[in-house]
Swiss-Prot record:
GO terms for biological process: AMP catabolic process; pyrimidine deoxyribonucleoside metabolic process; pyrimidine nucleobase metabolic process. AMP binds at G170, S196, R197, A198, I199, T200, S201, T205, S266, K290. The active site is at D258 (proton donor). Pfam families: Glycos_trans_3N (PF02885), Glycos_transf_3 (PF00591), PYNP_C (PF07831). This is AMP phosphorylase. Signal peptide: none annotated. Belongs to the thymidine/pyrimidine-nucleoside phosphorylase family. Type 2 subfamily. It catalyses: AMP + phosphate = alpha-D-ribose 1,5-bisphosphate + adenine; CMP + phosphate = cytosine + alpha-D-ribose 1,5-bisphosphate; UMP + phosphate = alpha-D-ribose 1,5-bisphosphate + uracil. GO terms for cellular component: cytosol.
Amino acid sequence: MLFLNAKFIDLDLGENAVIVNEEDLKGTSYYPQDRVLIESHAGSVIGNIYSTKTMVNKGEVGMLVSELAEISISEGEEVKLRHAEKPESIPFIKKKMDGQVLNPHEIRTIIDEIVSKKLSNIELSAFVSSTYINGMNMDEISEMTKRIAETGDMIAWEKSLVVDIHSIGGVPGNKYALLSIPILAAAGITVPKTSSRAITSPAGTADVMEVLTNVELKEEEIKRIVKTTNGCLAWGGGVNLAPADDIIINVERPVSIDPQPQLLASVMAKKIATGIKYTVIDIPVGKGVKIKNEAEGAKLARKFIELGESLNIKVECVLTYGGQPLGRAIGPALEAREAIEALQDPKNAPKSLIEKALSLAGILLELGGAAQIGEGQNLAWEILESGKALEKFNQIITEQGGTPKKPEEIELGDYVEEILAPIDGYITDISNTAITNVVKEAGAPRDKKAGILLNSKIGNKVKQGDVLYTIYSGSEERLVSAINLARRVYPVKVEGMLIERISKF
């Protein structure tokens, strides 16, 4: 047992950690990465030991911001460190690593220990990897979904009909929600949209919306905003909705994986937590996204529908074209600009963005009773073209604490590079994977001003020297890295009409 004085450390490691001077560890049974219980007069918290020579003095224990807040410790206060018991879920994680089926108790224990931070990032990574490799059956996924939802707040609504649209993501520039949500809200449909930040893409809906307004809303704020406007566009992590999901996402993000069991549970847990009764799930299909073909998409759709039935949520899925970025803008600020431009002048907006936003909104207008079957997309267009969707979007921005902006008022990165066509020809491919990696290299989504603006799409004719796309970054170093990567992976490919000359010589 160790008695040390707490020292404030302004550091976020994504897990609970205690930093101890190596002199205090000598001659003890404590080693780096050991799990310990930190106790004070106000409570206790579990963390993993990290040793240091200089960060804290002998007799001190460095504690992170989240830990100090969790048990209300004052800096300099004496705390007690002792060995913590191994988490109950460790053998259950090993069981899943061996490809076995987990029972409800085992699944609930794993989720509970994720939320209570009893599992280290290494242990959590093992669980995520095991579900990525070995998968889960529907009973396991349903149990995990319910428990993830139960670990956080649950929002109840006065209205019985509450709807939502959700995309499984993977498509760069997937900003459709900034059009679809205000269209639905303008039609009188209750649509409290909560989104995650980017996992595998350069910008999630929450990242894009954060360029324009506050997305970290509490439950009562969401209720107030939705009561006033019929809709919102918020980050799910700010509301303590399904907190286990956000912890899992933080482990998935560095390796850009989104295991299908976690994907299903993540999406549907948020629907339970936000009181959704009807939801449309967008499943992009194509090269460089999560789902490669229509057969895979249909299989996933059936899983969503089956999971929804077990949770009493009506689910309708749509397979959408995901073979290239949606619209021309990729990256938070650029996507926010393009969304506002589309709301202001939909006739001149990218057709792919308009068509997707209208299609998804149209389905929910029909499910919500605002339009007859087959007429939803027409009503969605009327709302968009009339300016009512823009008006509603600006109202949502204002209610969430922002100020409506013109597209040109949204700042982009100061460091800019235009990438030119090397030859005359046609654009034959735009790689989602390469575009995503280049935009991330430029700094997105953390750097909101970073991104790529495409000048042309697949099938367009270009001449040598034409601008194919422009890279933006808030950092000169990041821009150089993005340019170097782009030169290696060729996000946009141009080919002439003559592919190859073949003769017998």
